[in-house]
Structure formats: structure tokens, C-alpha cells
Amino acid sequence: MASSMLSATTVPLQQGGGLSEFSGLRSSASLPMRRNATSDDFMSAVSFRTHAVGTSGGPRRAPTEAKLKVAINGFGRIGRNFLRCWHGRGDASPLDVIAINDTGGVKQASHLLKYDSTLGIFDADVKPVGDNAISVDGKVIKVVSDRNPSNLPWGELGIDLVIEGTGVFVDREGAGKHIQAGAKKVLITAPGKGDIPTYVVGVNADQYNPDEPIISNASCTTNCLAPFVKVLDQKFGIIKGTMTTTHSYTGDQRLLDASHRDLRRARAAALNIVPTSTGAAKAVSLVLPNLKGKLNGIALRVPTPNVSVVDLVVQVSKKTLAEEVNQAFRDAAANELTGILEVCDVPLVSVDFRCSDVSSTIDASLTMVMGDDMVKVISWYDNEWGYSQRVVDLADICANQWK
């Protein structure tokens, strides 16, 4: 049985350069909406971060030496981002990543972890160890390769939690194969299908039920949308609305025109704006049930590799002004949504939000109110890095309330 370990630090989640330095990029402390962190702040901030999500982190326990044994299934964009984010938390993390399932093998896993076209070169010593492991700053992580989760050696390795990052095993039957293989719990890094409980850190993760063996971290877009929608609904009352996410292309699209079940995603991703579906708006009701049936939306996939932006338009029941809407966001960002929500007052563009640790950054200058009851909000998010930080946070919550 694994126990949890929490840091007593009081530094908010996203303050200054922080974890972007672990990604191989220059520090994002230069972004004007963030203060410059001291080195002490930085080490505190990366040591452990779920303390900064209001009540979502659950009760704290004293630090112990035992850690949750974690395996990553699928070492693609989210799997590798997750490992970098976890590595950035340092020794204070209650997680211990001990295994990766990747069909590409050891050489490919180590190379793609070290060298990343979006994140840059990983500031860690990464190398293969024989034919079945990689080393990250001396930490040896076993690499296995099997497309069928039922065959994975999770029982033999004593795996407590599987980070399911393939995007394939998202229902109880599929994710349950990890439990059949000996793992105790599964965290899906995608919207779950069926009745799988969905949690968004900062929104409803305080309701986490440790008796559930399979949970979902929702989608990157839901993680961006839900925090500020929660603020809007609490302060002004949402009647109905629509959302458009202008979303960077993903691995589910085609580099050149080729077959795909979605005829639009079949078209060349780097050459087109690709309208497609998203369940993010409807999925908000999974974490904010009072909004069921009130939101819907679409996605526009665009030729950028990372960072996306949500455009939400809602009708509200309480008359308001743009300044009041932004102030509500500022208040939440300074309190219960510290480290989850930020407000930016500078005219930035998508690349400026690369490796942003938060789930959602409101572009304050673009907030509009038409009449007195139609509100338009624009919010940026790093759909890979920011989302992966929340996966680590939710895994930390699992560790904190392990049973």
C-alpha cells in the first residue's frame, strides 16, 4: 500500500519561470502577467503543487518515504509531457514513475523524451539502459512494449497507478485491462466513456472518490474551459452559451491528405483550418452538473503545433460589465483558482503561452459584454504542457487520498 507525501510550501502553482526551465525552454518569467520568482520560490513551487488548488487537493498528510508506483501507458505527447512535469516536481513528489509501455522501444523513447520539437531539449540526462529501460538523471525506468494492456507486467512490478495516455483505452472495459494486469487504479488522460468519473483540478477534484479504480482527467479544452465557466456561473449565472476552441493540430490528424473516419481530419493538418467536433463544452456538465444542456461548441484545428485558445460566448442572468467580469476572474485567480487560472493584461500571441503551467489564461483585453447580458471571454491554454501538469496534480491527489 502506497502512502502519500505532501509539501508544506505555500507558493502558488504558477509563479514565474518555474517548470518551463525543465522543458528546455527559456524561463517564462518574462511574461508580464507573472511575477519573477526567486530561486527559493522556484524550488518550492516545483516541489509540489496541488496545495494551490483550493479545496481540490484533499486533506494533507505528513511526508513519508513511500511513494505511489506509477506506470505510463503510451509514451506520446501527453506521456512524455507528463514525465517531464513529474520530473520537475523533484523528490517531494508522492509519485514514483517506474515503468513505461511504449511500442517504439527504448531507443525511440529515450530520444523523443530528450529532444522535443515543441518543448526543446530536456534539461536532464536521458539515455537508454540496455534493451529494456531508460535512465532520467540516474532514475531507471523500465520500458515494456505490448499493445494489449492485459499482458503488461503491472502486478509483477507492483504498479499502483497507470497513467493511460494512449487515447484508446478510455472506457471501463479498455482501462480495466490494466487492473486485470495487476495495477490498482487507472487515470485516463482523455475524456472517459460511459460512467467513468471525471475530475478537473480546481473545479471538482475536491469530490474525488478514492474508491473509484478508474477516473478521467477530462480533455485539455475542458480543463481550460471549466475553471472560468465556474467563475462566470457563480458570479453572473449562465443561461446558455457556445464555445469555439481554436486548437493546434494533434497526432489524430493527417500530415498529408489520407483516410480518416472524420473527412475533415483526413485533410493535411499543416495546410488547413479544419473544423471538427469537440465534446469539451458538453463535458463541462460532468464537473459542473448545473450547466447540463447549457453549453455546446466546436473546434477549429489550425496549423500550429501547440497552444490553443477558447472563445466562449454566454448569456448571463445578472447584468454586468466587462470590467466586472475580469475582476471576478482576477479574484478567483488570486484565491481558490491560484495556479489554475491566470489573467493576462498584455497583448500576447499563442507562442507566449507555451509551457504555461496553468490550465487557463484569460486575455483580459478581449473580454466583451454586449448589451448587459451577453459575455464573450477568450482564454489561452497550452494543450499539452498545462494539461499534463493537471494530470500530475490529479495523480498527486490520488496519492494523497490513497486507499
Curated annotation (Swiss-Prot):
One cellular-component annotation, GO: chloroplast
Residues bound to D-glyceraldehyde 3-phosphate: 219-221, 250, 265, 278-279, 301
Residues of the transit peptide: 1-66
Annotated positions binding NADP(+): 77-78, 102, 147, 383
Molecular function terms from GO: glyceraldehyde-3-phosphate dehydrogenase (NAD+) (phosphorylating) activity; glyceraldehyde-3-phosphate dehydrogenase (NADP+) (phosphorylating) activity; NAD binding; NADP binding
SUPFAM superfamilies referenced in this protein's UniProt entry, alphabetically: Glyceraldehyde-3-phosphate dehydrogenase-like, C-terminal domain, NAD(P)-binding Rossmann-fold domains
Group of enzyme by EC: oxidoreductase
Keywords for this protein: Calvin cycle, Chloroplast, NADP, Oxidoreductase, Plastid, Transit peptide
SMART domains: Gp_dh_N (SM00846)
Metabolic or biological pathway, per its Swiss-Prot or TrEMBL entry: Carbohydrate biosynthesis; Calvin cycle
Active site: 220 (nucleophile)
Catalytic activity: D-glyceraldehyde 3-phosphate + phosphate + NADP(+) = (2R)-3-phospho-glyceroyl phosphate + NADPH + H(+)
NCBIfam families (UniProt xref): GAPDH-I (TIGR01534)
Family: Belongs to the glyceraldehyde-3-phosphate dehydrogenase family.
Comment field (misc): Plants contain two types of GAPDH: cytosolic forms which participate in glycolysis and chloroplast forms which participate in photosynthesis. All the forms are encoded by distinct genes.
Protein name: Glyceraldehyde-3-phosphate dehydrogenase A, chloroplastic
Organism from which the protein derives: Zea mays (Maize)
